[in-house]
Structures are given as C-alpha cells and as structure tokens.
C-alpha cells in the first residue's frame, strides 16, 4: 500500500470510527435493551413489535422495573416511540434489520435493493464481471469495459465519454439510501500482486438513522491498478453522501456525488504475437503503442427529490402510513451534474516501432493519423453540465398496492451546457453552447392481485433542444404459485426516439474533428423472461430493433446507419444444488444482422462451480470453487483513448479463451475473507495463450489476490 493510500486509509478509518462512536451513543439513547428475564417486559415488547416494528422499548423506573401505561403520566421522563411511518415500505420491509433503496428522480417512488453481506459473488472483485456473462475490458481494475451482453450496454446521450466506467460510478440515479435499526458500517479492502504492479480496492460505507424515518449515509470507493505492462495504470474514486426523511406525509431524498477517473493510456500491445513469443521475457518489457497518453475526468453532482402528501381520508394517530388511503402528493426533483475531461499526449509518446520476430525494426508508426491543432502535443479539454428541474403530482386512488396503485404526471426543464475549445475560439474567445429542453411525462403502476402487476412510463419532449424525443417503457409480471413457490413470467416493451448525443454531432480535438447533422435514432425493445427461483432457473428472450442507429465505425468516428439493424438474444441461467455442491451456469446467445454496426459474440458464458459448507454451524461458512468466463471469437469493439469511446474495429478477432479464477471464501460472523488465484488459466491451455478481452489489450497475468469485508451493526 502506497504512502498516499495509507494516508487516505487512516483518515477514512478515523472518520468511520468517530461516526461509529457517535452512532453507538445515539443508538443507546434510542433503543434500550429489554430484560430477557422479565416476562412482562417481553410480552409488552412482542405486542409492540406486532403493531409497529420500531416500538419495542419499555420505560423503566428508578429500580429497573417496567412502568405500565397508566403510570407513565407520573414518570419524570416519558420517551415517545417514533414509528417508521413511510408509505414507501410495507410491514415486511419495516421489520428488516437493514434495508436499502434508490429514489426515483421522476416520480414519488423508490426501488428496493439488497444489502451486501452474503458470500454470493463476494470474490468477484471486478465490478464489471458481476452481471450475467461479464464485460470485455482492458485487463485491469479501474479500467474501461463494455458488456458482452448488448442489451446491457450503456445507451445514454449525456457525456458518453465515461460510458466505459459505468460499473464504478455513483450517480443520482443509483445512489443508495439505507434504513437501519442500528448504525451500519462496512469496511472492505482487497489487494493483489507485488507493490509495483498491485491492484487495490477500498470501500467504506457508514449508514445511520437519526430517527426511524430519517437517516444518512456516507460512501467512499476507490479502485486502483498499477498494471504490469508499460504505461498501464487506472484509478477510479467515487464518493457519495446522502440523507433522507420518509415521514407519514413528507419525504425527501438528497445527496451529493463525486467521481474521479485517471487512466494511463498505452493503446495496447504493438503486436499480438508479443504476448506468446519468447522475444520478450517479461510483460513489463513488451512494447506498447503509447507511453505518455493520459485521460482524466471529474464529476460533481447533487440531487434532491421531495414530495408532500395530502390524505383525502382523515388519518388517526394509530395509522402509521398513508399507503392504503386515498391521497395525492405534490413533488419536486432537482439535480445538477457536471463532468469535465482532459486528454493529453505527445507525438513522441504516441510513436511506436514495428519489429520482426528477431527484434529488427521494419516500420515506425504513430497511433493517430491527424494532429489538427499541434503537431507535437495534445491537451484536449471539454466539459458538460446538466441542471434538471421537475415538478410532479401523484394520485393514489385508494391503495398503493391496488389495481390502480398510483398515477404520476409531471413537467420538466433540462438546461444543458457544453464546453470545448475550437480553432475559431482564438478569434471569438472561449464559448459555451447552451440548450434548454422542456418535456412532460406520466407514470402508472398497479397490482391487479398477487398474480399480476404492471407499470408504464412515457416521456415526450415538448419544445427546445431534443424536441420530439419520445421515451416509452412498459413492463408487467405474472405470478403462479406451486406449493407457495413462485413462477414469474415477465414482459417488457420499450420504444425510444431520441436526438443523438451532442458529442456525436459536434467534436473538436487535436486528433479528431467532426460536425454531423444526424437524424433522430429510434430503438424498439422487447423482453420476455421466465424465472423459477426454487429451481434456480432464469430464461430470457431479448429483441432490439435499431433505426438510424448512430455508432462509431472502423475509423473510430461516428456514423449513422440508415437501414434497420436487429439484435436478438437468448439468456439462460440454471443453478443446480446437490447438498453443498453448487453448479451455476449463465449462458447468452446473441445474433446481430449487421456485425459492422453492432458486434456481439455468438456465445458467451459464465460458469461458477463451488462447494459450500459450515465447519462451525451458524458461525463459520466456507466456499471453495472456480469461476470461468468464455466467449466465442468475434470482432470485439476497439477502444480509442483520444475519445474514450468504443468503436467497431474489423482488424482482429478475440475470444475462444477460458478465463478462470480459483478461490476460497469464508464468512465468520460479520467478517468475509477471500483468497483467489486470479487468471489461473494463464498457463493451463497451451493453445490459448493469446488471452485478449479487447483487441491488443491482454488480460492481467496470473496473480494471488486476497481481501476482506467487515461490517458493524452495533
């Protein structure tokens, strides 16, 4: 661990322990323990838990005896138990020790999540390898990646330069909020390799409730790899602070986020055969295409979503929630997000030599064809900001879980600012492009019965920038129960008509310049999934039709495809369990009608085989196994450092290589630990040494990785 990392570690640890100390004191004041030897106190506590999960406290007199209700008026101090009154959460959620959710920035809803305390996928330390069949990547932690599953690839149109870092970043749309009956802290650290080439990740999260309905959380994550190849280093750091109140009538979710990216760009190996030939004895000696290119990006944002409810049926003191009452809500959402980026290099640092297998130089080339501004060096900067205001109304006819649960309607105003240097700015001065967009949207959702629920959303841009853009999304679930075990059939339909990204239309830098006038692109999505949790079965069919699709072609610049492109996918997840033996399979089949526009592997798979057992029952759980990823050969997307964008290269195919990790994971009470031999397959397959996930970017070499996660909830 470097001195800088240690310094950050010490400061973060000090803050966390200080918060834990304060939280422990606050918890002691709010949640006194019940004497388990007193049956009267136990009975009262159990009854109060039935009525309200947060009611469990019995007032005691000076002798330690419980004060009954009739005597409380004479007590010197009376503690009023405040319940969790929110209409967002039902009784089953309220009774959880910890639960987590994400606030919807369009409507008065939240989306529930899972608290990470289990062994499941704990050893998968690369964030981009967790979902289904994983991502194609540049081989290091803190580097860019793009999903092999086309239907998960980022498809936004705001600051697309950082799409390759989607799995790391905290945004207002995915910032998490926690409710905890006790203060909750997670501290996790992982490392691998020699200090010179080490990979490290550090995660610290603290969440605490001030009252049962009010809480805050702090999150800090950093992912860092020094790399084993020349000029290979990546680092992503993110921070978020959130606060919420989910009261009986008023709710608010607010927070700030910050993300920073620093990436040394080496452009990949000069020649793929360098990886397997004996000409170079070590990875550090292999020539790379660039030796001084650097990308840096920084993001700062804040958000606040609030709503006030007006019940149309009188509420009583015994009613904890408005969820089952006729009511309407008036709400407001505001967010601000700014990204800034800088790319730098030199002509000398981007020039490389081509050699034969004896080491003789046969050619000299530069990574870039064009040097528009300066023939010797690049220093490209640009920025984008978005200020969003939304005002919405939500109608709740009679019950949030009813046939017509809620109907939302709102209007929004987005203010965009784009900043980049152009040659004409030498004459006119630095200029900022500003756009305003005005739109309306609606949302409806309900639950016909325990067998059927549905949801629909529509947004239409009325005027200004991106006028005429349409976004429609509808989904539903059907439930069938066999011996109380659910079988879930889900469907989703989506349609989008949208203006291409500002940066696909206008871009100026030392290496790339374009001004386009692309038409609106359209996308139609259809998904059908069948899930049988008791059998470990998940089957999904996906179909996407792309019209006027904007993509980055073989020359790494944006183009628009006039014809319709279709992408079809079939996903299967089947988990088998035989006692402690688990055999988990994830397989994805995909087909694109035009591989030069949308390139996907025909088959991609992730297999996880492990044995799980408890050496000490209910105290120590151990998991030993292997994870493997594989995909068939295809023309994987290339990565362009100057634009931070993926493009459809047609030079080299990658794939047909099994990437395998072997690991041991254990959970002892509140601590999880793991030891992993990463890329264990490096020397197992003599014919598969050309191990690439992206063209010219080899996987990291085999190394031993270890780490731990410790959570505190007291």
Indicate where each model-derived feature is located.
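Bacterial Sec-dependent N-terminal signal peptides
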Residues: 1-39, 676, 701-702, 707-714
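Exposed, low-structure sequence patches enriched in small/polar residues
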Residues: 180-182, 292-349, 355-714
């Amino acid at each position: 661990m470097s001195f800088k990392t240690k310094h950050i570690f010490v400061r973060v640890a000090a803050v966390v322990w200080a918060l834990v100390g304060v939280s422990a004191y606050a918890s002691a004041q709010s949640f006194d323990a019940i004497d388990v030897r007193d049956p009267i106190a136990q009975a009262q506590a159990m009854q109060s838990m039935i009525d309200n999960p947060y009611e469990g406290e019995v007032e005691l007199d000076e002798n330690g005896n419980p004060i009954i209700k009739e005597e409380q008026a004479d007590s010197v101090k009376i503690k009023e138990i405040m319940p969790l009154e929110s209409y967002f959460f039902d009784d089953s959620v309220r009774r959880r020790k910890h639960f987590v959710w994400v606030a919807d920035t369009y409507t008065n809803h939240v989306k529930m999540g899972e608290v990470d305390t289990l062994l499941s996928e704990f050893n998968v330390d690369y964030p981009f390898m967790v979902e289904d069949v994983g991502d194609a990547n540049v081989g290091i932690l803190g580097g860019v990646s793009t999903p092999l599953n086309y239907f998960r690839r980022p498809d936004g149109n705001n600051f697309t330069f950082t799409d390759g870092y989607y799995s790391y970043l905290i945004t207002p749309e995915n910032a998490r909020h926690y409710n905890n009956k006790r203060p909750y802290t997670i501290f996790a650290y992982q490392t691998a390799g020699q200090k010179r080439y080490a990979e490290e990740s550090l995660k610290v999260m603290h969440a605490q409730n001030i009252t049962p309905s009010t809480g805050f959380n702090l999150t800090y994550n950093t992912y860092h790899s020094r790399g084993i190849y020349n000029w290979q280093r990546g680092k992503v750091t993110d921070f978020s602070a959130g606060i919420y109140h989910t009261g009986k009538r008023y709710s608010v979710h607010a927070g700030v986020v910050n993300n920073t990216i620093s990436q040394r760009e080496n452009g990949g190996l000069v020649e793929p055969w360098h990886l397997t030939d004996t000409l170079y004895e070590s990875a550090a000696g292999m020539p790379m295409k660039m030796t001084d290119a650097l990308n840096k990006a920084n993001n700062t944002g804040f958000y606040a979503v609030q709503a006030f409810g007006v019940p149309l049926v009188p509420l009583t003191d015994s009613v904890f929630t408005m969820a089952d009452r006729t009511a309407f809500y008036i709400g407001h959402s505001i967010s601000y997000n700014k990204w800034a980026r800088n790319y730098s290099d030199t002509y000398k640092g981007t020039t490389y030599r081509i050699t034969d297998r004896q080491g003789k130089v046969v050619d000299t080339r530069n990574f870039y064809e064009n040097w528009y501004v300066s023939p010797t060096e690049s220093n490209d900067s640009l920025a984008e900001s978005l200020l969003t205001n939304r005002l919405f109304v939500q109608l709740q006819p009679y019950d949030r879980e009813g046939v017509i649960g809620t109907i939302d309607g709102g209007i929004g105003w987005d203010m965009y600012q784009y900043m980049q240097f152009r040659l004409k700015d030498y004459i006119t001065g630095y200029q900022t492009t500003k756009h305003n967009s005005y739109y309306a949207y609606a949302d409806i959702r309900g639950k016909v019965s325990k067998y059927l629920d549905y949801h629909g959303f529509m947004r239409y841009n009325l005027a200004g920038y991106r006028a005429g853009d349409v976004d429609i999304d509808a989904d539903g679930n059907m439930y069938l129960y066999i011996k109380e075990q659910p079988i879930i059939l889900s469907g989703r339909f989506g349609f989008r008509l949208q203006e291409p990204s500002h940066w696909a239309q206008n871009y100026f830098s030392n290496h790339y310049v374009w001004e386009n006038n692309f038409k609106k692109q359209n996308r139609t999505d259809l998904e059908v999934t069948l899930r049988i949790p008791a059998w470990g079965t998940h089957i999904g069919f996906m179909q996407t039709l792309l019209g006027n699709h904007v993509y980055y072609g073989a020359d790494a610049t944006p183009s628009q495809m006039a014809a319709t492109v279709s992408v079809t996918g079939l996903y299967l997840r089947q988990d088998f369990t035989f006692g402690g033996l688990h055999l988990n399979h994830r397989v994805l089949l995909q087909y694109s009608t035009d591989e030069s526009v949308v390139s996907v592997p025909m088959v991609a798979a992730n297999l996880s085989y492990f044995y799980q057992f408890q050496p000490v029952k209910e105290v120590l759980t151990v998991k030993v196994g292997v994870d493997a990823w594989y995909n068939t050969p295809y023309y994987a997307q290339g990565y362009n450092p100057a634009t931070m964008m993926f493009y459809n290269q047609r030079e080299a195919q990658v794939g047909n290589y099994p990437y395998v990790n072997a690991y041991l994971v254990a959970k002892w009470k509140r601590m999880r630990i793991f030891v992993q031999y990463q890329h264990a397959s490096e020397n197992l397959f003599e014919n598969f040494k050309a191990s690439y996930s992206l063209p010219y970017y080899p996987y990291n070499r085999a190394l031993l990785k270890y780490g731990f996660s410790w959570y505190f909830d007291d």
